[in-house]
């Protein structure tokens, strides 16, 4: 089941996403987040987390770095500054404007 869901997301990333304008306000993108959540938390919890992330991604939020947390939650990652890609995390969360 997990491989099927990851395959469906990859089909979306390869064939559907390129013809749509970029709208994701987060890093990693919602489709990459879904794949990471499926790998980290399995088919059921990963799918729920991925869908919750898609619902959070809308024009009324700021966005930013939101990696998949190590535990199941429907909320945004409370410690995005600990993201493994420090350069990207700093770019999104620096105090400089």
Curated annotation (Swiss-Prot):
It is found in: Cell membrane. It is a peripheral membrane protein. Keywords: Cell membrane, Membrane. One of its GO terms (cellular component) is plasma membrane. It holds the Pfam family YidD. Could be involved in insertion of integral membrane proteins into the membrane. HAMAP family: UPF0161_YidD. Belongs to the UPF0161 family. This is Putative membrane protein insertion efficiency factor. The lineage of its organism: Bacteria, Bacillati, Bacillota, Bacilli, Lactobacillales.
């Amino acid at each position: 089941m997990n491989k099927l869901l990851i395959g469906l997301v990859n089909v979306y990333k390869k064939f559907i996403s390129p013809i749509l304008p970029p709208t994701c306000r987060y890093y990693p993108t919602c489709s990459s987040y879904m794949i990471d959540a499926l790998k980290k938390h399995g088919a059921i919890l990963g799918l729920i987390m991925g869908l919750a992330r898609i619902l959070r991604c809308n024009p009324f939020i700021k966005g930013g770095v939101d990696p998949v947390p190590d535990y199941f939650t429907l909320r945004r990652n409370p410690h995005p500054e600990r993201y493994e890609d420090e350069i990207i995390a700093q770019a999104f969360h620096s105090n400089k404007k």
